From Swiss-Prot:
The keyword DNA-binding applies. It comes from the Viruses. This is Terminase, small subunit. Homononamer; forms a ring-like structure through which genomic DNA is translocated into the capsid. Heterodimer with the terminase large subunit; the active complex is probably heterooligomeric. It comes from Thermus virus P23-45.
Amino acid sequence: MSVSFRDRVLKLYLLGFDPSEIAQTLSLDAKRKVTEEEVLHVLAEARELLSALPSLEDIRAEVGQALERARIFQKDLLAIYQNMLRNYNAMMEGLTEHPDGTPVIGVRPADIAAMADRIMKIDQERITALLNSLKVLGHVGSTTAGALPSATELVRVEELVAEVVDEAPKT
């Protein structure tokens, strides 16, 4: 499988060669002289493609918003879960209405367990999403490939894990 001219230009550029060196190097392999203008054209196309991509800050903001939406959704589910427990306990006591006058709704234990599982799954998904985003941003967010997440980002992971533990359904 042959490597395209564009791919060769980009690989050499990423290795630190300047456009004139790339043109000279590729001219040695080619059956014709490669000009610096051709190399610059390929690099300009690559820059144009990259400029259309969202910035790391945009990606971080989107991840943060998605995690916040998941947290809010999870809190809503947790409130439903707690209401299910309240109704189940009242039902087990033989009550037909709560002290505040609201009617007792019949709830099955299987429904309560399914809701608890869903809440815990959201916890796992939130932590996994945050860790994956930190891993990706660590690879592309610095000049050193594979850089570790910043201390602030690690603190955010610890806060999320603590929040998940605090909000876990208790049966």
